[in-house]
């Protein structure tokens, strides 16, 4: 917790230093006319991004909240460990790849969609090839790996990780490329629609699970299938946006 706080504090301090530097260098260009123009020009960012971020956080936390309420703390702890371990490559590798990719296509701009399409296809292919082996290992040997690494009592977390691995594989491919494309091509409304569909999919799964009185395993299987399809079609949508702009 202390490390997290220090890390966040360091990031905020650096942000304010950079902000101060840019403000001093560009304050002479600020005018009421420019403020009004850019407020209108980029109004879609706060209008769609803020609710999108809220829905993203809601759908991400929904599984733990549902399992804590319906199945108890022990099962929730097992799922928490499984999702945390599977999310590490998405957080580390996916975030770094996404930032580098975003910087490259932002430099190119949306006026060269053919070049962006080629780059995006190459990045998605490399992400898939890079992730297919580790996620396949978790899919087939997750319970054994978790038992060896964390102990016998975390065997069930390995089972859950095995179930969730297909969905997190599709998320690993989608996340790095989506932010760049949807921002560069100014499709902020699409971001909101994608997050709405994820929330609806998530709550539909848990609603069915509750009505049918499913076990945690069956619930996670449907959840993993649902979100795998969600990210598959969301990735297709990203490529469709580029093609449509050609």
Go through each PLM region and give its residues.
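Interhelical loop/hinge segments that connect adjacent transmembrane helices in multipass membrane
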Residues: 3-4, 9-60, 104, 110-118, ...
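Hydrophobic alpha-helical transmembrane segments
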Residues: 1-23, 196-201, 215-240
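Alpha-helical transmembrane segments of polytopic membrane transporters and translocases
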Residues: 47-48, 63-64, 77-94, 126, ...
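Helix-loop junctions and terminal segments of transmembrane helices
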Residues: 82, 86-111, 178-184
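Interfacial transmembrane-helix starts/ends
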Residues: 43, 113-129, 136-140, 158-161
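Interfacial segments at transmembrane-helix termini and the short loops linking adjacent helices
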Residues: 114, 140-170
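Membrane-interface junctions at transmembrane-helix termini in multi-pass inner-membrane proteins
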Residues: 166-196, 240
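Helix-loop interface residues and adjacent transmembrane-helix termini in multi-pass membrane transporters
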Residues: 70-73, 184-185, 213
